[in-house]
Amino acid sequence: MINRILIRIKVLQIVYSYYQKGNGDLKVAENELLFSLQKSYDLYYYFLLLIIEVTNLQRRILDTRKCKYMPTDEELNPNTRFIDNRFVAQLAENDTLKKYVDEQGLSWSNDEEFIKNVLNTILSSEIYAEYLKNEEDSYETDREFWRQIFKKVICGNEMIEEYLEDKSIYWNDDIEIVETFALKTIKKFEEKKGSKQALLPMFKDLEDKAFAIKLFRQSLLKGKEYRERIDKHMKNWETERIANMDLIIMQVALAEILSFPTIPINVTLNEYIDAAKYYSTPKSGTFINGILDSIVNELKKEKLLLKD
C-alpha cells in the first residue's frame, strides 16, 4: 500500500527533522521513519474502520428512537437499508482487519462527535437519498453505495481532513494518498470471499521497504558529499536566500539517483521537483531542476553515472 511517492515524502520529512535537531542519532531517525510509515498504514485501517463506525452509530440511534416514549411509526419501523448494508457486514468480519486493529489498538471510540458529523454528512447527501430509493437490492448495490460515498463525500472533505490532521501529526501529508488506497480496497471487495477478503499489505513487496531504508541511510551517510557537490553548482546563487528544504530535496534526490541504478533519472527528477512545489517556495521546482540537471551532467562526464 505504501508506494514510493509516500516513501519519498516521509524520507524528506525525517531527513529535514534530523538536521533541524542538530544531526541526531541515525538509528533513532531511521526508527522514526519506520514509525511514520507504520502510521500511514494505520490511517488506511482507520478509513476502513470509519465505515463500520458510522454504520454502528446509526444502528444505535435507530434503536434508541424505538425505545423512546411514544415513538412515531417511522421510528418504530425505520428504513434499515443503511445499517443492513452487506458490504459493511462483510468488512466488519474481515479477518485481516480485526487482527490488525486488535494488534495495533486502533479505535474511533474517543471520537464520537467526529463520527456523528461524518454520519450526518452522509445522511444528508444525494447519494444516500438515491440509495434508499434504489429498487435494486444486492451486495453490488451496497458496495457501490460505499464506493460512491467514500469517493464523493469522504475523500477531499475539509472537515474530515482537518480532524485527521489534528488526530495525528504523521497524517498531514498522507491523507489524499491513503484515501485512494481505501477506495481501491472497497472496489475490490467480493461477496464470495467473505471474511477472507484480502486487504492491501503495508508494502507491495520487500523491495519497497528496502528502498525506504536505503534512500534514508544514503541521504544522511553521504550527505556531506552530496552537499559539497550541490554547493559547487550554486556558486551563482545567493546561498543564504536558498530555502533549507530545497537543499534537503536535492540531497535526497542525489541519494536516489546514485543509489538506485534501475530508477530512470527523469523519474527521480520529476518526483523531487513535484515535492519542491509542494514543500518549498513557488520557484523551488525550477531552481532544483536546474541545479540537479547540471549535477547529473557532471556525474555523467565523470563516469559516476551510467544510467539515463
Region locations from a protein language model:
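Class I Rossmann-like S-adenosyl-L-methionine
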Residues: 1-308
